[in-house]
Regions:
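Nucleotide-sugar donor-binding/catalytic module of glycosyltransferases
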Residues: 2-240, 244-249
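Non-catalytic, C-terminal membrane-associated alpha-helical segments of glycosyltransferases
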Residues: 256-263
Length: 263
């Protein structure tokens, strides 16, 4: 029986990686190289073609045909924005953990192995790593040592106040699915209330103090091209959603900070 359990565990996907793609044909091969070179092999990669008008969808299909055991593609019936595209990927994901990547960015080949191994040490619900932003020439780690381990209200507040980016983290997939946590469609700041909702539901967190994610800031990417999304009502919608979260637990001051960030 123990042998069978070990065998089944070996077959399980450890990390699902969801990648929204919008008119990113010139970045797809580089993105694929980053993923194929990952040292963690028990991964599934879910590309979501978010209504691209270039050859992105065709290129993704070609790669999925070449590497069907790792890659799959979802073709959205409409332009949902990076948040909506990620939601389609979340629904399809089967891994123990889930991570997100933007097609035009770069990840270290050891990123998902290091994040997963850290998560497996003590069953952490969320693990973060440091990132480097090419445009600003700055690096940062959102989840510092002061807010790792088992979470209390003080640590939760610190996470919410400096929540960072979804792409530098992996999350226990069951936390997202069991609590029906989703990302807002077609708005800017789509990460913000998503990450705050997760912070309110996870029990513990950890970090890997290495720069494993390179943020490229390409203007035409799915996450950076506003495609008419930069509107006042978008920010207002996220602001109101964050305001409602303050009733979930004792993190009111952190929620106020997050709302200021949104503005």
């Amino acid at each position: 029986m123990a042998i069978l359990i070990n065998y089944m565990e070996e077959l399980m996907v450890k990390v699902s990686i969801v990648i929204p793609v919008y008119n990113a044909e010139k970045y797809i091969d580089r993105c694929v190289d980053c993923l194929l070179n990952q040292t963690l092999k028990d991964i599934e990669v879910i590309f979501v073609d978010d209504g691209s008008t270039d050859n992105s969808g065709l290129l993704l299909e070609q790669w999925c045909n070449k590497v069907p055991d790792i890659f799959q593609v979802i073709h959205s019936d409409r332009d949902r924005g990076p948040g909506g595209a990620r939601n389609l990927g979340i629904a399809k994901a089967t891994g123990s953990y889930i991570g997100f990547m933007d097609c035009d960015d770069i990840i270290d080949r050891t990123m998902y192995e290091k994040l997963y191994n850290k998560a497996a040490e003590a069953g952490y619900d969320m693990v973060d790593c440091a990132y480097y932003n090419e445009l600003s020439d700055e690096s940062a780690l959102a989840i510092g040592d002061n807010i790792t381990g088992k979470l209390d209200d003080a640590k939760r507040s610190d996470i919410i106040a400096g929540v960072g980016y979804a792409v530098t983290k992996i999350f226990r997939l069951s936390v997202i699915k069991d609590n029906n946590i989703r990302i807002r469609e077609n708005v800017i700041y789509e990460d913000l209330d998503f990450l705050i909702n997760i912070a309110l539901k996870i029990n513990n967190t950890a970090n890997v103090k290495e720069i494993l994610y390179i943020y490229k800031n390409n203007d035409n990417s799915a996450s950076h091209n506003n495609r008419e999304q930069i509107k006042f009502n978008d920010m207002l919608a996220v602001y109101k959603a964050i305001d409602r979260l303050k009733y979930d637990c004792n993190v009111d001051e952190a929620i106020k900070y997050a709302k200021i960030t949104c503005i």
